[in-house]
Amino acid sequence: MPAFNVDEAHGLGVFGKQGRGVCDHFGVTEDIDLIMGTFSKSLASIGGFIAGDKEVINWLRHNARSYIFQASSTPAATAAAREALHIIKSEPERIQRLWDITSYALKSFRDAGFEIGET
């Protein structure tokens, strides 16, 4: 059976209800086996995450090479990511403002004669 893994590095805080990412945006969260992402983009921190079934996460913890010599996140980095998640969830106008700025930038580039494709 195929496994579906989604990297939400660029979707978290941007897509979906309350910025939950592309899986939420397209309504497929329950169909995804692993969701991974980083804290260094929309959460303005360091570190990352992988979410999935408990058995899979435990297997990764014990067998993935990327865990060798891995250190835990610092309390400050964890607190920063947590607060950023709270802000994303409680201030949806920030996501709307992002999309307003994006639309303005795309229109401005097109009006200036740039070929930017369909985005």
Language-model-detected regions and their locations in the chain:
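Short glycine/serine/threonine/alanine-rich loop segments
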Residues: M1-P2, F114
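Conserved PLP-dependent catalytic core of the aminotransferase class-I/II
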Residues: R82-T119
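General beta-strand structural signal in soluble alpha/beta enzymes
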Residues: F4-E8, M36-G37, F69, E118
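Fold-independent oxyanion-binding glycine-rich loops
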Residues: E8-A9, F26, T38-S40, G52-K54, ...
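Conserved core segment of the aminotransferase class I/II
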Residues: L34-M36, L43-K89
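Active-site pre-lysine segment of PLP-dependent enzymes
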Residues: M1, H10-L34
